[in-house]
Each structure stands twice: as structure tokens, then as C-alpha cells.
Regions:
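Accessory nucleic-acid engagement/destabilization modules that flank
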Residues: 1-31, 35, 100
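Conserved phosphate/pyrophosphate-binding and hydrolysis machinery centered on Walker-type P-loop NTPases
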Residues: 11, 49-53, 81
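Conserved pre-motif I regulatory segment
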Residues: 32-75
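A substrate-engagement module of RecA-like helicase motors
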Residues: 33-44, 99-208, 213-216
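Walker A/P-loop NTP-binding motif
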Residues: 64-65, 84-98, 119-123
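Walker A/P-loop
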Residues: 69-90
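Generic beta-sheet signal
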Residues: 71-75, 101-103, 207-210, 234-236
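Signature of the SF2 helicase/ATPase Hel1-core->accessory helical subdomain module
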Residues: 87, 114, 118, 190-207, ...
């Protein structure tokens, strides 16, 4: 059903509305343009922060060439060689040369996300102009004891969209390493949902540090980057990629739990005899498999 509403406006009213709308877009376009300019300028002069260890320079060169040629590279290197900096540094150089728009650093563990944050911080001390955000799971960002994502239950969800643009604009003008703690500080200040805020911030930074799920899991992946029709020139650094195999199995596997089937059966017992019988059949199959 299509419903039409007719609203009559004067030319002056339309002009005022249009100029206000354009002003909002222009300030973001101006930010993105100048941010990319300053980022690329800083990358031209960026030097590796330490003397190269054995094998580090060869690794960095291989990473840069792979990204410039839009290929894939699998790296197996001993612990302690400095793989994080040796892959992040050439990836940033590749972005500076126009071989990518955004860097995704993917990890399986919280501790390795901290290593990536530290690598960016070290390079910023060398003059790097580069903003990054660490995406944290919703339940670890939520201010409530139990996440309830609706305006009636959560004061941060109520009016979120009225305040989030100003919140994003301020944080990307004041911060470079946008970690969980930084997000919580600004989310509290502006009274916005920290998780949704974090996702919106990701659209206006150059690097994203996150779990594998946000790229590979079909249910969790970031739709703004990976939905059908979404396009972008992205560079992916997958830390400890051997962990991706079992994680991918989990992402693409369904799970049925016997206790849940029995709980559902109890709920519908007096309401749907047919569904109750079907659930009982499922329960019997579980019992047969258990034998």
C-alpha cells in the first residue's frame, strides 16, 4: 500500500531546508577530504619505527607488493619477529599510495586487538596521521546489565539518532586511537548507544580493529561494508589466520539443543497439539543419536 501526503511549502522554506541539509553533508565531505589529505601526507614520510630485525624488511616488502597487486599472502613466521608492525606498516604505505581506502585488522582474541592498537600508537608517535576504531561486542559495550535495544527500556537508545551525529563528529576530530574506553567516555557524554555509536564511527576512520565475525560471519558481518551491493577498496590483515578455520565452521554451522526443544514443547503443549507432536519427534531423534 502506498500512502501519499501533500505538504505545501514556500520557496523560502524549501531553500532553508535544502541549505540546512547540504550544510550537514558538506561538513562531513570536508572532513573526509582533509582527513585523507593529511593521512596520505603523513604516510609519505613515515619510516619504520625500529631497526629492522632479520626477515622483517623482506616481510614488509612482500606485504606491500601483495597489496599493490591486489593479491593474497599467507605468512608463517616465528614468534618475536614483529609480524604486527611488519604487516601494518606496509599496509598503511599501500593506502597512502592509493591501493586501499580502509584497513581491517582482524583478530580472534581480545589480547591481540591490544597489540594492534599498540602498533598504531607507535606509528602515530612517528608522525602518522591515522584514525582507528576498535569494535567491541555489544554486551561488552552496553551500559545496561542486560542489553535491551529499545527506547522504552534504554535511555541511551531513546533519542540516539538525534545526538549521534554530533557525537561522531566530535570524537573523530579529537581522538585517533578510538578504543573501547574512549567510546564509552563519549557515549556517556552524548547519551548514545555505545555499540551503534562505535559502528557509525567506523565509517569515518581509516582503520578498523575487530573480531573475525564482523567480516566473515553472514549473520554478524558489518552490512555497511559487506552487504550485497556495498563496495570498497579494503585491505585485510588476518592475525593468527589458522584460527579462522574452526571459527568459520562455527559461523556456518547450525546448532539444535535438546533442552530448548523440550522447553518449546512445554510452552505449546496446550496450544498446538500438532506442533507438540513434531517437537516430540525431534526429541526422539535426539535420544536415538545419544545412544
Amino acid at each position: 500500500e502506498v500512502r501519499l501526503f501533500q505538504v505545501i511549502k514556500t520557496m523560502e522554506e524549501l531553500k532553508e531546508w535544502f541549505m540546512g541539509l547540504i550544510h550537514e553533508y558538506v561538513k562531513w565531505a570536508r572532513y573526509l577530504y582533509h582527513n585523507a589529505q593529511r593521512r596520505d601526507e603523513s604516510l609519505k614520510d613515515l619510516e619504520f619505527p625500529f631497526p629492522y630485525r632479520e626477515g622483517q624488511r623482506e616481510l614488509a616488502v612482500s606485504v606491500y607488493r601483495t597489496e599493490a597487486r591486489r593479491r593474497k599472502l599467507f605468512i608463517q613466521a616465528p614468534t618475536g619477529i614483529g609480524k604486527t608492525l611488519s604487516t601494518v606498516f606496509p599496509s598503511l604505505k599501500a593506502i597512502g599510495e592509493g591501493h586501499g581506502d580502509k584497513l581491517f585488522y582482524l583478530t580472534a582474541k581480545t589480547i591481540t586487538r591490544g597489540v594492534a592498537e599498540e602498533a598504531f600508537a607507535i606509528l602515530r608517535e612517528q608522525g602518522l596521521y591515522f584514525r582507528s576504531v576498535t569494535i567491541t561486542a555489544k554486551d561488552k559495550l552496553c551500559f545496561l546489565e542486560k542489553p535491551e535495544c529499545n527506547p522504552d527500556a534504554c535511555p541511551y537508545a531513546k533519542g540516539h539518532f538525534d545526538r549521534v551525529n554530533d557525537a561522531v563528529y566530535e570524537i573523530v576530530h579529537k581522538e585517533f586511537g578510538i578504543t573501547r574506553e574512549v567510546i564509552l567516555k563519549y557515549a556517556e557524554k552524548f547519551k548514545v548507544c555505545p555499540f551503534e555509536y562505535c559502528l557509525d564511527i567506523s565509517s569515518f576512520v581509516d582503520g578498523i580493529i575487530c573480531d573475525y565475525n564482523y567480516v566473515f560471519d553472514p549473520d554478524v558481518r558489518l552490512k555497511r561494508y559487506f552487504a550485497d551491493g556495498a563496495k570498497g577498496e579494503y585491505i585485510f590483515l588476518i592475525d593468527e589466520a589458522h584460527n579462522l578455520v574452526p571459527r568459520a565452521r562455527e559461523m556456518y554451522s547450525a546448532v539444535l539443543i535438546k533442552e530448548d526443544v523440550l522447553a518449546a514443547k512445554r510452552l505449546v503443549k496446550d496450544k498446538s497439539p500438532r506442533l507438540t507432536r513434531q517437537l516430540e519427534r525431534v526429541n526422539k531423534i535426539f535420544l536415538e543419536m545419544k545412544r
